[in-house]
């Protein structure tokens, strides 16, 4: 019988040989999930013996990972802004880059409009909604996505993070007119699809083959959703409101130009932790 440390080392070595960059971290996550433990608990129990059931589960997880499936989809959970998030193949896996968007929402609202009404457009898993709701406990939020299956995950995350009393989920198309009665907002935050259609096939296979293409494909120029959201949703902003976008690399200038052409008073750009221009803030 193997110890948890044996299982971890074997998993780590297999991932390393297969070229997985974060092989040690991923090995810990996979073994911990298979054992129904947190990573902290796993590290505490490394010298304890595992069970055949756990070993079989790790073998299955490892095979899936070596085929390219992302760890988040294997475990069904991921962390965003310090919060637990359920994920599956119906939603994009939350990225650290998107935490810059949450930071921008806080920058706009903290000390100015703590009880703001915030719209999360193209909400996917609801990670932005949950993070903003957790960080700004007086806000009221609306989470919108076209995908019914994504909204199921969003609702589950809202409930898991105890935000159901402050969040409404709605199904709507970000590239069309807003539904009647949705109201107005102090902030509209959006991480829309922004990968150029022609670049989808160049993405890493863990993204290209497993994450939902419709949540990645931003049209021929990657800007389709930005154009539509500015056109159709700008009218929902309250006076002095802000439209805050996550953008792809080298898209910030184009999106700022669109905002200014649409009559926004100002446009600011914020960089992510890697120094990439990741967020654009348009102010009415």
Give the positions of each predicted feature.
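Non-catalytic accessory regions of SAM-dependent methyltransferases
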Residues: 1-43, 47-50
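Conserved hydrophobic residues forming the short capping helix/wall of the S-adenosyl-L-methionine
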Residues: 15, 109, 158, 233, ...
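Conserved AdoMet
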Residues: 32-108
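Active-site beta-alpha loop architecture of Rossmann-like, nucleotide-cofactor-dependent enzymes
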Residues: 72, 195-198, 250
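Conserved SAM/SAH cofactor-binding pocket of Class I
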Residues: 97-202, 227-228
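C-terminal beta-strand of the catalytic ATP-binding
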Residues: 194, 283-284
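Mobile active-site "lid"/loop adjacent to the S-adenosyl-L-methionine
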Residues: 194-224
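Conserved Class I SAM-dependent methyltransferase catalytic core
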Residues: 220-283
């Amino acid at each position: 019988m193997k110890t948890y440390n044996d299982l971890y080392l074997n998993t780590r070595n297999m991932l390393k040989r297969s070229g997985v960059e974060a092989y040690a971290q991923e090995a810990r996550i996979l073994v911990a999930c298979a054992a129904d433990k947190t990573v902290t608990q796993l590290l505490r129990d490394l010298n304890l013996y595992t069970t055949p059931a756990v070993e079989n589960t790790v073998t299955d997880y490892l095979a899936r990972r070596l085929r390219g499936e992302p760890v988040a989809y294997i475990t069904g959970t991921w962390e965003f802004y310090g919060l637990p998030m359920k994920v599956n193949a119906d939603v994009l896996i939350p990225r650290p880059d998107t935490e810059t968007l949450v930071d921008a929402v806080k920058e706009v609202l903290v000390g100015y409009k703590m009880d703001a009404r915030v719209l999360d457009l193209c909400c996917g898993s609801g990670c932005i909604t949950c993070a903003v709701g957790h960080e700004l406990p007086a806000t009221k939020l609306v989470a919108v996505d076209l995908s019914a299956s994504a909204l199921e995950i969003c609702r589950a995350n809202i409930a898991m993070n105890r935000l159901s009393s402050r969040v409404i989920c709605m199904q709507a198309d970000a590239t069309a007119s807003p539904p009647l009665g949705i109201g107005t907002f102090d902030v509209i935050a959006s991480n829309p699809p922004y990968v150029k259609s022609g670049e989808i096939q160049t993405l890493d296979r863990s993204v290209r083959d497993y994450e939902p293409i419709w949540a990645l494909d931003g049209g021929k120029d990657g800007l389709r959703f930005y154009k539509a959201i500015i056109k159709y949703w700008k009218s929902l902003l309250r006076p002095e409101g802000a439209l805050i976008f996550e953008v792809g690399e080298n898209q910030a200038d184009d999106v700022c130009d669109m905002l200014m052409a649409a009559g926004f008073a100002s446009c600011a750009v914020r960089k992510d932790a890697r120094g990439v221009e990741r967020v654009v803030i348009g102010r009415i």
